[in-house]
Amino acid sequence: MRRRWEYWILMLAMHKIGVIPIPSTNQLKAEDIEYRIEQAESKAIIVFDDGHILNEIKTAIGNRNVQLISNDEVAKSISTMPDTLERVPNENSDTMVIYFTSGTTDMPKMVAHNFAYPLGHINTAMFWQRLHDGDIHFTLSESGWAKCSWGKMYGQWLAGATVFVFDFSGIATAHDLLSAMAENHITSFCAPPTVYKMLIHADFSKYDLSALTKADVAGEALNPEVFERFQKATGIKLHEGFGQTETCVMMFTSQWIEPKPGSMGMPAAGWDVQLLDEGGRPVPNGTVGEICVSLKNGHPVGLFQGYHKNDKLTSKVFRDGFYHTGDVAYRDNDGYYWFVGRNDDLIKTSGYRVSPFEVESVLLEHPAVREVAVTGIPDPSRGMAVKATIVLNKYFQGTDVLIRQLQDHVRARTASYKYPRVIEFVDSLPMTISGKIRRALIRTLDSAKDTIIEPVKNVIGLSKDDEKQK
């Protein structure tokens, strides 16, 4: 289902009677749904006929013994259900909810959270989002993602805040979102960076956002350019948070520390976060390491139990006394953490390690660049070369001159080995359903090309330095 009020009733009811819900986005296709049915051994699917999804589900179910429950049946059940439901006894360690990951690097995995999970979101709502009684909080996520649990249910209610539900079909525009915030006196807003990248192009003077005092961002790393432009438009400093479907918020910018544009802040209370090298040793400040959570004092409240029905993968991430996130970051001398990327996203070129996020942040400062994904492509002389796949702003054209300008722009602002030796201009970037850039897909598409540099230089740009080397 989309963002519908029935979701909250259904979730609470299932928690109470012992049914394990698996919230899913209504943007799935039949193949996606079939995969989820098989992996989870689903017994029933509750669907609200919003567009295509009912037919997709029927196709996915086929002859399987899976009960399909329609919105009419749900409405009838809600209207006739007793005031109280008999609660099925459970332990904190029992599975409460399962989420499928968005599948940025592999097939979606089933993340199992137990009944202590809601308490983990006290950090999320009270200390990251700074919510309290009287707040009206607006998290954009639809109900099929773990971000809905982060921003629309457990922690917010524990904080005494009102949750604002705004449903829309398709893609909401900046006008849609800003109008909703103005008309409903929203005091707190949370969305992924892709939404803020859209909002900063709007004319904020047309909307009365005087009630808005807090804004948060999570989902991917936030480029400093977006932070600064949003603050200039609203006077509000974005508070970045970091976590995964497998966790609640585990690092964030709290009310007690000054936001640093692009930093995800400091570890949450109860989370012993350490940055480890490939040998499992802590790294010093300024050195990139994998974000790991120490388990020496047990699982932090809000950390998942494991991957449902996948002991092999669970043991891969829970090892040597740590939960290994697969994400890498560095810590500065003030104790702030800075996201670098997924381990798989790091580009190793000429013996250096390049963070895609760092190069993307620099490119986004250029007026021509609307969206960008930086990846590595094979290069015989360097191992990997840095490539930028770019969506241009209106009125800009992807010429050789612009390619040189963008390369010079990066070289002037960061180490020379980080500049993109190859630039490709595209109409759009491949995204997951949850709005994250699919860098792995870009790498896969690039790897399918016969050779790396020569065939693409006339199409997507090659620096003069590279041509001389050839």
Regions found by a protein language model. Give the residues of each.
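ATP-dependent adenylate-forming carboxylate-activation enzymes
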Residues: 1-2, 19-37, 49-53, 141-143, ...
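Hydrophobic alpha-helical segments in the ANL/AMP-binding
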Residues: 5-24, 33-34, 125-127, 147-159, ...
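Structural core segment of the AMP-binding/adenylate-forming
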Residues: 9-12, 16-79, 89, 186, ...
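AMP-binding/adenylate-forming catalytic core of the ANL superfamily
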Residues: 28, 35, 47, 189, ...
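Conserved pre-ATP/AMP-binding loop-to-beta segment of ANL
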Residues: 81-100, 106-107, 130-136
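Active-site loops of AMP-binding adenylate-forming
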Residues: 115, 204, 232-233, 244-262, ...
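Conserved AMP-binding/adenylation subdomain of ANL enzymes
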Residues: 119-187, 202
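Gly/Ser/Thr-rich phosphate-binding loop
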Residues: 154, 158, 186-191, 200-260, ...
